[in-house]
């Protein structure tokens, strides 16, 4: 199979950009969040039923993939178009060697000098087509700006509504700061009685890096053992131990 045309390369990238067979993960590449995958997953996506169906309907845009060499040619066209770039996933120790800060949630990726197209080699998507959500976001921003500029023309009931909403928002912020101060006072007072447990916390996950609802669960806890970050760290330890045992 000859190298796909530029139009075919774009069509294939659009089709496979969010394909489930890629089993994409998110990582940090050049200080930004990106999607990355293994080369063998891309080959699997090209051999999927979804791609085969497209290939039958539009063979000029989606060339048939009958061998690994065909998949290789398609992938090379994506590299030449700079839709994907080879990368190396760094471990924590390697991050420090390259002056990068290890991240608990997202692995750090480093640009590779060559693409060998090995099954377990990592590749990063640099192609990010615009989605409907992106267009809706732009439209929403424009509508919001125009609505704000036209505030003097708003009817009285809308102005009253925005006033009450702003008061409610300020009240919520005040309640949040109030809870933060109360929990700190309770913690300091509890150290004398339960210092061996690390102190008593109301809403131990209040300032943790988690969702809004999770920030208020559980209602109370002792020390850091009820914290979201501590529990997440313990889960990672158990997973790593399980992998080593396998």
From Swiss-Prot:
Gene Ontology CC annotations of this record: endoplasmic reticulum membrane
Bilayer disposition of the protein: Multi-pass membrane protein
TM region positions: 135-155, 169-189
All ranges on the Lumenal side of the membrane: 156-168
Topological domains annotated Cytoplasmic: 1-134, 190-246
Listed InterPro entries: Sec62, Sec62_asco
Function comment: Required for preprotein translocation.
Family: Belongs to the SEC62 family.
Subunit composition and interactions: Part of a complex that contains SEC61, SEC62, SEC63, SEC66 and SEC72.
Protein name per UniProt: Translocation protein SEC62
Originating species: Kluyveromyces lactis (strain ATCC 8585 / CBS 2359 / DSM 70799 / NBRC 1267 / NRRL Y-1140 / WM37)
Name of encoding gene: SEC62
């Amino acid at each position: 199979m000859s190298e796909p045309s530029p139009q075919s390369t774009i069509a294939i990238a659009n089709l496979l950009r969010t394909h489930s067979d890629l089993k994409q993960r998110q990582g940090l590449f050049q200080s930004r969040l990106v999607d990355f995958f293994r080369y063998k997953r891309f080959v699997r996506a090209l051999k999927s039923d979804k791609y085969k169906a497209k290939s039958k309907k539009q063979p000029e845009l989606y060339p048939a993939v009958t061998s690994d060499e065909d998949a290789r040619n398609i992938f090379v066209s994506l590299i030449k178009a700079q839709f994907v770039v080879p990368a190396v996933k760094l471990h924590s120790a390697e991050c420090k060697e390259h002056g990068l800060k290890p991240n608990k949630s997202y692995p750090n990726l480093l640009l590779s000098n060559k693409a060998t197209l090995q099954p377990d080699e990592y590749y990063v998507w640099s192609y990010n087509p615009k989605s409907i959500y992106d267009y809706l976001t732009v439209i929403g921003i424009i509508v919001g700006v125009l609505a704000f500029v036209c505030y003097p023309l708003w009817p009285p009931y809308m102005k009253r509504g925005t006033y009450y909403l702003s008061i409610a928002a300020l009240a919520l912020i005040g309640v949040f700061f109030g809870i933060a101060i109360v929990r700190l006072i309770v913690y300091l007072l509890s150290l004398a009685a339960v210092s061996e447990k690390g102190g008593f916390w109301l809403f131990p996950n209040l300032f943790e890096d988690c969702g809004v609802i999770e920030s208020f669960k559980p209602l109370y806890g002792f020390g850091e053992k009820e914290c979201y970050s501590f529990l997440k760290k313990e889960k990672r330890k158990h997973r790593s131990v399980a992998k080593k045992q396998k």
